[in-house]
Structures are given as C-alpha cells and as structure tokens.
Amino acid sequence: MAIKKGILFSLLILAFSLCANLTYGIAEQNRLKIEVIYFHATIRCESCLLIERQTRETIEQVYSTNLKDGTLSFSSLDFQDEQNSELAERYEIDSQTLIVQISNGSKVIKWKKLEKIWEYMNNYEKFRKYIVEEINEYLKEVKNGESKN
C-alpha cells in the first residue's frame, strides 16, 4: 500500500511539473516583447557601420535590464542574404533600415521603420534621443499590454 501511495505521489508531482512547464512555455511564447532590427547590405559603408554601432551602444546602455529580462532584443541582419529575404520582403527593405516592432513570439503585432536615423546619424545625442523615444513608446505598450491584436 505504501509503495502504491509513493508511486501515485511521484506521478502527481511529475504531472504537476509538466503542467507548470507547459503553462510557463505558453505564457513565455505569448509574452509581448520589443525587437529592434537593423537591416544592412552585404557590403557595408562607414555610415551603415556607424548607425549599427550607435544603435547597439544606445540599446545596451539604456536598456540593459530589458535585454537581460528578454523584454527587448537587438539584432543586425543582412537584408541581401537569402536567409533574410522573407523579412526583407515583409518590411519592404531595399536599403539600410532600422525597425522597431512588438511581437508575441510568433506574430508581429506592430512595427515601424525609424526613418530619421540617416538624418541624425552624425549627431549622436539626437540619434540616441530619437531611438530612445521610439523604443520607449513601444515599451509603454508592452508594459500596459495594449498591443493585443
């Protein structure tokens, strides 16, 4: 009898653990997050490298907590690479472009091209302020759970 209770207890703990992990996985998958993506060409000029460097520095300095907790991510992709052609097509990318978007893991809910990066690239303070303002707008929506489409 004690063995049966022990086995039953072990099975209950196992079932509970599986359910908890499954629930966590689903919640994590549906969690809203900000993705900042810099699309660049295969051959890169100094201006393109500068924009990426300034964007990366800004994000790492201002949003280190968000990067660590997964609320925000930054990536740099070659839009001319065949692997990224679907994304380049989705966002109508034909030159170097910075995108900020809200997604819930598998679905992009809202996105925007940050077109003033070229205008501000030679003024780091304006560049940084512009990117921070745009990302903060999206972060507000994520924190408030407003972007649910």
Task: Indicate residue ranges for each PLM-predicted region.
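Bacterial N-terminal signal peptides that target proteins for export
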Residues: M1-L11
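Bacterial N-terminal signal peptides
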Residues: F9-A20
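Solvent-exposed, acidic/flexible segments
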Residues: A41-C48, E52, D81, Y120-R128
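Charged, often glycine-rich, active-site loop that binds/positions anionic groups
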Residues: S85-D94
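Local sequence-structure signature of Cys/Sec-based thiol-disulfide redox active-site neighborhoods
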Residues: N30-Y63
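Bacterial Sec-dependent signal peptides at the C-terminal "C-region" and cleavage site
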Residues: L18-N30
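Thiol-based oxidoreductase modules, predominantly thioredoxin-like and allied folds used
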Residues: L67-Q83
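Non-catalytic, surface beta->alpha helical segment in thiol-disulfide oxidoreductase systems
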Residues: V100-N144
